[in-house]
Amino acid sequence: MVSLAVGTQTNGSVIRPASFCGVYGFKPTHGLISRTGILPQSPPLDTVGVFGRTVEDTALLADAMTAFDERDLHSRLRARPKLLETALSSPPLDPVFAFVKTPVWDLASDDCKAAFDELADVLGAGCDEVNLPGPFDGAHAVHRTIMLADLAKNFAGYYKRGADKLSGTMRGMIEEGQATLAVDYNVAVDWVELLNAGLDEVFARYDAILTPAAPGEAPAGLEATGDPSFCTLWTLCGTPAITLPLMEGSNGLPIGVQLVGCRGDDARLLRTARWLSAYVDRIAE
């Protein structure tokens, strides 16, 4: 319908829909693109992302949007990354991938699991299955604590003026957030650095993490937008991630591959994503 689009992700609202729609979706490092003007839900998590037809599309748009903004408290003052230029370059060596199933692997559909096992086999020596350390098992609960406490704060006016007009799901989320203690919130926020320290060990050996973007194909019906569980960990850690539309499920609908990079290394992730897309295309010929 359009060549480029912009979205936001607090849990999985860039990576997941890109997977369902068979397009590329790029969620940059938290703070890389300013969020000034968007409705805040959870500032430690909220991230502006982009959609495109190719890796190059997403790199082009993200490049144009990347800048320091003093109005955004999480905006990072640093050298502007050359996203498109790096994405278009060739890696000095073939990338090596860490296939991470994450603690929510059991939520993946059978065809999703089979497709990822096949991709790992195709990559051969360039892909190792890697298990994350024990603390990552609690990451989803940490994300929920942060997200709902912030939601309760930022949506307090809507709740006060018209709680009866909100959906039952939204009311429940706000009320759960209202019950969060400040000490629990602060502990949850501190977890982010602990988890990223664990990820740094992975990225010292691998160019990117390979993992599902969603549990499988898009769900039928309009009651829900799908399960974001495969995005939660990476949103919490603030790492860059990109969806590549490389697979199909049993119903012929897209299943996206999610690549995750080290915080701040967005350009390298985009270059790796472009390499993998081209590699899979060559194998499929």
Please annotate each region the language model reported:
Residues 8-103, 117-118, 122, 180, ...:
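Structural helix-boundary/capping segments
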Residues 1-8:
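A short, small-residue-rich loop immediately preceding and capping a beta-strand
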Residues 198-200, 224-245:
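Small-aliphatic-rich amphipathic alpha-helix that forms the alpha element of a beta-alpha
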Residues 83-86, 110-132, 156-161, 185, ...:
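Acyltransferase
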Residues 2, 206-207:
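Short, high-confidence coil segments that cap the C-terminus of an alpha-helix
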Residues 91-100, 142-196, 200, 245-256:
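Short helix-loop capping/hinge segments that flank enzyme active sites or metal/cofactor-binding pockets
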Residues 75, 142-143, 187, 213-233:
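Short, surface-exposed loop/helix-turn segments at secondary-structure junctions
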